[in-house]
């Protein structure tokens, strides 16, 4: 077995039954590189091997221990292949009562194999939970109610495995045989959520191991290498440079930013001032990612038994238990490289001399100059996600006037951020991750403002750009003009991401949503048929309860689902959908059914501002009277006081359409769109506000539930 093998041990069942237990334990120990947990793990393996040697006697097939599921950052205890059926076994030591999370865990393993493991695509998969202690078993087995042949988890006593296997063999007698060797080596092509991907990168896995093989994985890997090379070159030549990374929607630009930050910080672990910081103006994304990484790090420390240690009082010699690594410490560690851009900007603004003159000046009375970093912040590499959303001069000046009572600010946010990094003596690097097509706020400067700032104020900075910015498909004429005037630019390959990784079931979901919102009915009908053929579900209802029931019936394991609506959807309150109530995005995205703030509790609703950049498995979009279908074009409205008013502002109309674009592209596996019936007794919820939209959506081919 090689170091990159996806499993620790694989043999035919007959070979496993004949092999000496000590040889099996030795093979497992050699494969396991976690030396500090081997003693505990060995005891578990001893129990598993002894149980399975007894229970699998008389069967033919294959057995695999510790099969890796990179997307989830876990390993399946045991996979058994018998007559075309995949049995996924998860053993629980010392447990007599199985909780919800244990069921979700083994179900997640089975679903992950079904979705992303090629050799498992057409095979029945049976998740089994086997507590070592006494338990109430579930030997009454019904045929899988799901079209993909993944069974619900069953709980078995350790001496009931053989009996359960026989029952499943009777039910699935027509299953096609599986070649054990080919199955174990089969291609695993995951499409992780951004939360899952970020967590695995933070754990030390590379981007290649956690993303879909082929175009997506290769594209991400090439771009990461290209950006790291820019950083190395800047350091070597003691230069300042700005590097632009572009990509199609859902191509993984955020993942590139996080990957570069994590890899650069690993390279510069013991080198002060050479670390990278990932900065985003998307506060919900930063909050959710930061908390997810911190929780995962903290939980792994507990698993490794480093969370508690003995403290000896020097005077008395008495021993006491002291809390070790805390969640607060984990959060601080994550915050060191993932931050909200507004906080970074605020720190640098505080260093400026007031009132503002014709040039930005440091107020030397209020800050100390570092010998190594000058007046800059400590990080020499700043990664700005969604860089096109940085504010124009008018927007930033207006904010400073309203919030800080500071007037006369003459610089755009891109120019100010470049100036901030220019305070470093020697080299510095800015990475701009640039997307497009989902503007939901006014005052966004776009890529042109970054180039304009370089041309105007920082001509010595080198500019690295992807060749695609000069393609005819790139529509930003102002940016093209600024780039043409830029004397320090250099075109680099591999700075543009071309393959989407957003939905593993419907690669054309974005195209469908575009045609739906553009009212291109013919194209929408055609694209809808294509995504339905890919088993991506979109259904329609007028009943919020039916919508919630549909979500609960579709979600399996720990798959996330929840309610979403436009931030302008103010007349959904009679349905108990209140967008004015601010959801706690961290709890909404990360917590389970036990927390009423969780998405899966189906009480709190999120808006486009909460979910942009994040994903659900299954979503419900509740459609209000803020966007009404009319065959001459969308009727767009804002709710003011006690009535709806037409939205006539060009940019606000664009943001409103894009709000629905964001909401309709958040669900990875399927969604239900709920268009309420309305109530003619309520002048703000007339049935006419909803009927035309419902009929339009239904005409595209959506099934009504």
How would you label these PLM feature ranges?
Residues 253:
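Conserved lysine of the Walker
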Residues 1-190:
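Accessory nucleic-acid engagement/destabilization modules that flank
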Residues 257, 440-444, 468-625, 629:
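Conserved helicase/translocase motor-coupling segment
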Residues 383-481:
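Signature of the SF2 helicase/ATPase Hel1-core->accessory helical subdomain module
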Residues 245:
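Hydrophobic anchor at the beta1->P-loop junction of P-loop NTPases
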Residues 429, 601-705:
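C-terminal accessory regions
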Residues 211-241:
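N-terminal pre-P-loop "Q-motif" helix
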Residues 321-421, 603-607:
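Conserved RecA-like ASCE ATPase "motif II neighborhood" in helicase/translocase motors
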């Amino acid at each position: 077995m090689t170091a990159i093998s996806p499993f620790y041990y694989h043999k035919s069942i007959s070979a496993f039954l004949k092999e000496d237990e000590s040889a099996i334990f030795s093979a497992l120990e050699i494969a396991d590189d976690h030396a500090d947990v081997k003693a505990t793990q060995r005891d578990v393996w001893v129990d598993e091997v002894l149980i399975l040697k007894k229970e699998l006697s008389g069967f033919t097939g294959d057995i695999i221990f510790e099969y890796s599921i990179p997307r989830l950052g876990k390993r399946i205890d045991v996979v058994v292949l018998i007559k075309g059926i995949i049995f996924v076994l998860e053993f629980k030591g010392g447990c007599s009562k199985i909780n919800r999370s244990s069921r979700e865990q083994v179900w997640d393993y089975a679903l992950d194999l079904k979705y992303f493991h090629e050799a498992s695509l057409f095979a029945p998969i049976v998740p089994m939970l086997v507590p070592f202690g006494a338990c109430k078993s579930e030997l009454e087995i019904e045929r899988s109610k799901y079209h993909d042949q993944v069974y619900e988890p069953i709980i078995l006593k350790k001496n009931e495995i053989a009996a359960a296997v026989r029952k499943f063999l009777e039910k699935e007698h027509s299953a096609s045989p599986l070649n054990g060797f080919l199955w174990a080596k089969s291609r695993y092509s995951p499409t992780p959520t951004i939360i899952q991907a970020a967590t695995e990168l933070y754990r030390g896995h590379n981007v290649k191991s956690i993303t879909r093989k082929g175009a997506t994985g290769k594209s991400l890997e090439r771009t990461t290498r290209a950006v790291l090379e820019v950083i190395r070159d800047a350091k070597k030549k003691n230069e300042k440079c700005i590097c632009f990374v572009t990509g199609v929607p859902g191509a993984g630009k955020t993942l590139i930013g996080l990957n570069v930050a994590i890899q650069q910080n690993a390279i510069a672990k013991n080198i002060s001032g050479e670390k990278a910081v990932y900065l985003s103006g998307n506060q919900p994304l930063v909050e959710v990612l930061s908390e997810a990484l911190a929780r995962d790090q903290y939980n792994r420390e507990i698993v490794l038994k480093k969370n508690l240690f003995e403290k000896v009082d020097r005077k008395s010699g008495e021993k006491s238990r002291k809390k070790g690594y805390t969640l607060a410490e984990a959060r601080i560690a994550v915050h060191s490289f993932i931050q909200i851009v507004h906080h970074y900007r605020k720190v640098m603004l505080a260093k400026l001399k007031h009132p503002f003159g014709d040039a930005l000046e440091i107020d030397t009375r209020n800050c100390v100059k570092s010998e190594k970093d000058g007046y800059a912040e400590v990080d020499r590499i700043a990664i700005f996600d969604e860089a096109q959303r940085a504010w124009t001069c008018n927007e930033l000046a207006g904010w400073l006037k309203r919030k800080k009572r500071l007037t006369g600010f003459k610089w755009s946010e891109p120019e100010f951020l470049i100036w901030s990094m220019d305070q470093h003596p020697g080299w510095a690097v800015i990475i701009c991750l640039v997307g497009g097509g989902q503007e939901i706020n006014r005052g966004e400067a776009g890529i042109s403002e970054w180039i304009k700032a370089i041309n105007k104020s920082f001509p010595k900075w080198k500019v690295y750009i992807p060749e695609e910015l000069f393609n005819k498909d790139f529509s930003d004429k102002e940016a093209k003009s600024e780039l043409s005037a830029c004397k320090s630019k250099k075109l680099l390959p591999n700075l543009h991401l071309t393959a989407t990784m957003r939905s593993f079931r419907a690669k054309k979901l974005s195209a469908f949503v575009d045609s739906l919102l553009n009212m291109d009915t013919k194209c929408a009908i055609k694209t809808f048929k294509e995504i339905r053929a890919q088993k991506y579900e979109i259904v329609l209802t007028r009943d919020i309860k039916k919508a919630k029931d549909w979500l609960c019936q579709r979600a399996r394991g720990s798959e996330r689902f929840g309610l979403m609506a436009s931030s302008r959807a103010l007349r959904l309150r009679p349905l108990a959908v209140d967008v004015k109530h601010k959801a706690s995005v961290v709890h909404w995205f990360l917590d389970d059914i036990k927390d009423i703030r969780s998405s899966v509790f189906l009480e709190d609703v999120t808006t486009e501002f909460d979910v942009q950049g994040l994903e659900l498995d299954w979503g419900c979009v509740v459609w209000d009277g803020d966007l009404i279908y009319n065959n001459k074009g969308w009727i767009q409205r804002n709710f003011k006081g006690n009535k709806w008013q037409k939205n006539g502002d060009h940019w606000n109309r664009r943001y409103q359409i894009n709000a629905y674009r964001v909401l309709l592209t958040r669900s990875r596996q399927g969604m239900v769109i709920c268009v309420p019936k309305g109530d003619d007794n309520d002048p703000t919820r007339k049935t006419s506000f909803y009927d035309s939209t419902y009929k339009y959506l239904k005409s595209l081919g959506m099934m009504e539930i």
